[in-house]
Amino acid sequence: MATKSVSTFAIFFILVLAIFETPEIEAYDRKCLKEYGGDVGFSYCAPRIFPTFCDQNCRKNKGAKGGVCRWEENNAIGVKCLCNFCSEEPSDQTLSRI
């Protein structure tokens, strides 16, 4: 019986943490990620190279610390190049759509 209550408490605790962390992630995206601009998403993100053209051009032309490609879920061509002004951490985006 004690195991069941501990498990229930653990699940509840993890759920609460997940709910409270979500707004921070969204706030980070709004503050740090800005769209490159223009209709460059597919041409900057489609070539399978590292670093992507998105990352290279965000650094060179916009003064950002990096660039990230965000693909739309239902549309393979719908992609945006977002310049990251907060973090230089590279992403695994080049391997995510192979």
UniProtKB/Swiss-Prot annotation:
Disulfide bond entries: 32-86, 45-69, 54-81, 58-83
Keyword Disulfide bond: yes
Keyword check for Disulfide bond: yes
GO MF, one example: sodium channel inhibitor activity
Keywords, alphabetical: Antimicrobial, Disulfide bond, Fungicide, Plant defense, Secreted, Signal
GO biological process terms held by the UniProt record: defense response to fungus; killing of cells of another organism
Pfam family, one: Toxin_3
SMART domains found in the cross-reference section: Knot1
Record's signal peptide: 1-27
Location in or out of the cell: Secreted
GO cellular component: extracellular region
Site (Reactive bond): 48-49
Family according to the record: Belongs to the DEFL family. Protease inhibitor I18 (RTI/MTI-2) subfamily.
Protein name, as recorded: Defensin-like protein 192
Gene name as annotated: ATTI7
